């Protein structure tokens, strides 16, 4: 979405193009990993740290954290996961409550962005009940504190847990979203 792509120069310009660029990078990483494996000890391709890391994602060694707010973005992330078989963690997921079955079926955990960020655009359909709805649906969920630039807003995380409790989540479960559940994800 625009919240993430605006942080990078040469940004894709559309969600479809962004997904196509991610797909292209995964394909490059697959090819790179095949060439490295085929080379054995000699004639290996030039080292590429980005492709090495993406190959580790595709091998399931590390999860991919994909920011997706709208239901359509979430479904795109799930399609990429199915296509390439990597471990996925959804980040943001403001409209996750609209695609619960798909998220649950994929076995994907969700890290929900702070409720205090109530902008328009991709967050216009966000609800303060998302965390409870996800938890009630059996989807692993955690809350994040958000950040300002590169500075985490750690003071916000307890507020977010309190908001989850205020909107129907039992206290112990709300506390778990910022402690043990977050650690498990």
Q: What are the residue ranges of the model-derived segments?
A:
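Polyanionic/metal-chelating signatures
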Residues: 1-88
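Glycine- and other small-residue-rich loops at beta-strand/loop junctions that grip anionic moieties
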Residues: 11, 43, 66-69, 91-92, ...
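Catalytic beta/alpha-barrel core
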Residues: 65-70, 87-96, 115-120
